[in-house]
From Swiss-Prot:
Subunit architecture: Homotetramer.
Taxonomic path: Bacteria, Bacillati, Bacillota, Bacilli, Lactobacillales
Binding of NAD(+), residues: V13, D34, R39, Y64, G78, V79, S100, T142
Cell compartments where the protein resides: Cytoplasm
Keyword Oxidoreductase belongs to the record: yes
Protein name: L-lactate dehydrogenase
Function: Catalyzes the conversion of lactate to pyruvate.
Binding site for substrate: R87, N119, P120, V121, D122, D147, S148, A149, R150, T224
């Protein structure tokens, strides 16, 4: 079976994703669609030079009609977040962009899997599913996977342990109402909260650092893209290779955590070649459960405001 990916949006995230994907798995065809057709064509030429090392991949600039026989459509297109702007502030700007993408992709006959990383990702993933009419398992958002990576990096630095020994998640909205699932976090097989120094003040400091890191990067260099691009590559690789992968993604909830709203929210889920296989409901303490439900309410209220 041919492995074909259509990338919509060739900005910093999209361009780095394309680079990472070719280094992560074998792709038979990668088509890049962007309003700036010269940039898309230029990136294809640049990426083509990598194939000497990564293996042969057909690379070209294209349009939405190229989704017809694609396995995955990755949406990174959108207005970037400005310093001081919340992800939810972006909704009105990016909703119109999303509609202009999803409608022609579906009209092409696309029957694969949507992967969304444009912000606010939980809302735009929910809207992608509603606009496309696709089964919920075939629409995935990057969710809190980047937040969770930042949490693991921070804990590894503080505890001076390898990153791979840290098992910790950020859940909820990829944005202001996200929270750390400290009560279930494990480091080297030991509960995080059993480690010396993991006081309430220390946990608050870690949470603040993780929450503010994205804004700090934006202030210093204008945008974040390396982390989310690599996360996208991992997600698409799991789909193309049909390998089970557990990540905290924007996934549809069906009563997990007592949330019955028709929304996508950052939660641990298993993905593979069929899309989202199932949600893994993590144990939360009372405070975390309240935060999860409050985060869902934030997303639902924003969606309701769109009419």
């Amino acid at each position: 079976m041919s492995r074909k990916v259509l990338l919509v949006g060739d900005g910093a995230v999209g361009s780095n994703f394309a680079n990472d994907l070719l280094q992560t798995t074998q792709v038979d065809e990668l088509v890049i669609c962007d309003l700036n057709k010269d940039r898309a064509a230029g990136d294809c030429l640049d990426l083509e030079d990598m194939t000497y090392f990564t293996g042969q991949t057909k690379l070209r600039a294209g349009d939405y009609s190229d989704a017809a026989d694609a396995d995955v459509v990755v949406i990174t297109a959108g207005v970037p977040r400005k310093p001081g702007e919340s992800r939810l502030d972006l909704i009105k700007k990016n909703e119109a962009i999303l509609r202009s993408i999803v409608d022609p992709v579906v009209a092409s006959g696309f029957s694969g899997i949507f992967v969304v990383s444009a912000n606010p990702v939980d809302i735009l993933t929910t809207l992608t599913q509603k606009l496309s009419g696709f089964p919920k398992k075939r629409v995935i958002g990057t969710g809190t996977s980047l937040d969770s990576a930042r949490l693991r990096v921070e804990l590894a630095k503080r505890l001076q342990v390898p990153i791979e020994s840290v098992n910790a998640w950020v859940l909820g909205e990829h944005g202001d109402s996200s929270f750390e699932n400290f009560s279930s976090a494990v480091v080297n097989g030991k509960p995080l909260l059993d480690y010396p120094g993991m006081t309430e003040a220390a946990l608050d400091e870690i949470e603040a650092h993780v929450r503010e890191k994205g804004s700090e990067i934006i202030v210093k260099k204008g945008a974040t893209y390396y982390g989310v691009a690599m996360m996208l590559a991992k997600i698409v690789t799991a789909i193309l290779e049909n390998n089970d992968l557990a990540l905290p993604l924007s996934a549809p909830l069906h009563g997990e955590y007592g949330i019955k709203d028709e929304i996508y929210l950052g939660t641990l889920a298993i993905i593979n070649g069929q899309g989202i296989s199932h949600v893994l409901e993590l144990p939360l303490n009372d405070s975390e459960l309240a935060k999860m439900r409050a985060s869902a309410a934030t997303i639902k209220a924003t969606l309701d405001s769109l009419g």
